Swiss-Prot record:
<protein>
    <recommendedName>
        <fullName>Peroxynitrite isomerase 2</fullName>
        <ecNumber>5.99.-.-</ecNumber>
    </recommendedName>
</protein>
<feature type="short sequence motif" description="GXWXGXG">
    <location>
        <begin position="56"/>
        <end position="62"/>
    </location>
</feature>
<dbReference type="GO" id="GO:0020037">
    <property type="term" value="F:heme binding"/>
</dbReference>
<dbReference type="InterPro" id="IPR012674">
    <property type="entry name" value="Calycin"/>
</dbReference>
<keyword id="KW-0349">Heme</keyword>
<comment type="pathway">
    <text>Nitrogen metabolism.</text>
</comment>
<dbReference type="Pfam" id="PF08768">
    <property type="entry name" value="THAP4_heme-bd"/>
</dbReference>
<dbReference type="InterPro" id="IPR022939">
    <property type="entry name" value="Nb(III)_bact/plant"/>
</dbReference>
<dbReference type="InterPro" id="IPR045165">
    <property type="entry name" value="Nitrobindin"/>
</dbReference>
<keyword id="KW-0408">Iron</keyword>
<comment type="similarity">
    <text>Belongs to the nitrobindin family.</text>
</comment>
<dbReference type="InterPro" id="IPR014878">
    <property type="entry name" value="THAP4-like_heme-bd"/>
</dbReference>
<dbReference type="GO" id="GO:0046872">
    <property type="term" value="F:metal ion binding"/>
</dbReference>
<feature type="binding site">
    <location>
        <position position="172"/>
    </location>
    <ligand>
        <name>heme b</name>
    </ligand>
</feature>
<keyword id="KW-0413">Isomerase</keyword>
<comment type="function">
    <text>Heme-binding protein able to scavenge peroxynitrite and to protect free L-tyrosine against peroxynitrite-mediated nitration, by acting as a peroxynitrite isomerase that converts peroxynitrite to nitrate. Therefore, this protein likely plays a role in peroxynitrite sensing and in the detoxification of reactive nitrogen and oxygen species (RNS and ROS, respectively). Is able to bind nitric oxide (NO) in vitro, but may act as a sensor of peroxynitrite levels in vivo.</text>
</comment>
<feature type="binding site" description="axial binding residue">
    <location>
        <position position="199"/>
    </location>
    <ligand>
        <name>heme b</name>
    </ligand>
</feature>
């Protein structure tokens, strides 16, 4: 077999494994359960088809930069739905030590993706809203658009910080499905000088879906 054949075979095996997984749910609730596997559960709302490739559970590693310098982190992102006109989003990350092992908890955010639905402005029908609550004490609203069928760009529109929250600037994020079906992203944030600087980047492999 060639290296190309090996890669195809490996991708097929990964797909076989991830296709059989889903997120755990309680099955005694009267409403549809969340699902991160499009093969299971309720149908995806048609309004979200342009975000379909994001649905799943993603795991991997990335690089970050803060006031103390560069660091590496591990991350899991869960993107699920319950048939409504939004996607659920939960991202958790943890710092890695120099040997690549777990060091400590890091960033965590939860929120929702949806498309703008404004009858008075049909031109906004492809605008994406991403509303996030961060564990470090602030809420952030992004707006953006799909760049193509497998990439999405968003920019901070508004920030609200709690009294105990960290002081942060706005951000720009780019997500995309890349070679091998992985989810990759980069985030730049506004620094104290008012310019966008690299903050986070990661490449995550599909674990569910």
């Amino acid at each position: 077999m060639t290296s190309g054949d090996d890669a195809v075979a490996a991708a097929a095996e990964r797909a076989r494994q991830t296709a059989a997984r889903n997120i755990p749910v309680f099955d005694d609730l009267p409403l549809p359960s969340d699902t991160a596997n499009l093969r299971e559960g309720v149908d995806l709302d048609d309004a979200l088809l342009a975000l379909l490739p994001l649905i799943g559970v993603w795991r991997g590693e990335g690089e970050g930069r803060d006031a103390h310098g560069d660091y590496r982190f591990g991350q899991q992102i869960i993107v699920s739905h319950d048939g409504a006109d939004y996607l659920n989003w939960e991202a958790r990350s943890w710092r890695l030590d120099d040997g690549g092992d777990y060091d400590r908890r890091d960033l965590r955010e939860t929120g929702f993706w949806r498309f703008v639905n404004d009858p008075n402005d049909p031109g906004e029908s492809q605008a994406i809203e991403l509303l996030l609550a961060h564990s470090s004490g602030y809420i952030e609203l992004f707006y953006g658009r799909p760049l193509n069928q497998a990439s999405w760009e968003l920019v901070t529109d508004a920030l609200a910080r709690s009294k105990s929250g960290v002081l942060v600037g706005g951000a720009k994020r780019l997500y995309g499905i890349i070679e091998g079906g992985d989810l990759a992203y980069v985030e730049e944030r506004v620094d104290a000088d008012g310019g966008l600087v690299p903050h986070l980047s990661a490449r995550l492999s599909r674990f569910v879906g």
